[in-house]
Amino acid sequence: RYPSYGLNYYQQKPVALINNQFLPYPYYAKPAAVRSPAQILQWQVLSNTVPAKSCQAQPTTMARHPHPHLSFMAIPPKKNQDKTEIPTINTIASGEPTSTPTTEAVESTVATLEASPEVIESPPEINTVQVTSTAV
């Protein structure tokens, strides 16, 4: 025990567990009504099948369901794979026209034919050239 340096307004009571078999009535938790063992046994069977209707203090002899608190449950993040993102378009007309660079892919097919008696089985080569133009 620590030495007290002033007046102590709290009562010093020994801590006794509610389910202590050596103390029939703990200091701070006295049962409201005495029930027969048959009723207690019936309540234990019902507590496994019927959820409790209130979150108030229940008798300590009832078997309780393990209900984890929400802070201990992991909630996966929402997945938006099915939805495609729609870009936002500024609908306010501005006074100055803006130039947007556009990139177009131009394909040119070049077939190289040589004067040879062999048969060429390879497909013609395809070259892709990027052309960038600015539209005003």
Curated annotation (Swiss-Prot):
Q: Which Pfam families match?
A: Casein_kappa
Q: Where is this site: Cleavage?
A: F72, M73
Q: Would the keyword Secreted be found if you checked this record's keyword annotation?
A: yes
Any GO BP: protein stabilization
Kindly list every residue the record annotates as glycosylated. T88, T98, S99, T103, T109, S116, T132
UniProt KW keywords: Glycoprotein, Milk protein, Phosphoprotein, Secreted
Q: Provide the protein's localization.
A: Secreted
Expression by tissue: Mammary gland specific. Secreted in milk.
Q: Give residues where Phosphothreonine occurs.
A: T112
Report whether Secreted shows up as a keyword of the record.
yes
> Where is the major localization of this protein?
secreted
The record's GO CC annotations read: extracellular space
Modified-residue entries (Phosphoserine), positions: S94, S116, S133
* Family as reported in the entry's similarity comment: Belongs to the kappa-casein family.
> What is this protein for, i.e. what is its function?
Kappa-casein stabilizes micelle formation, preventing casein precipitation in milk.
What's the protein called, per UniProt?
Kappa-casein
User: What lineage, starting at the top, does this entry show?
Assistant: Eukaryota, Metazoa, Chordata, Craniata, Vertebrata
What gene does the UniProt entry assign to this protein? Answer: CSN3
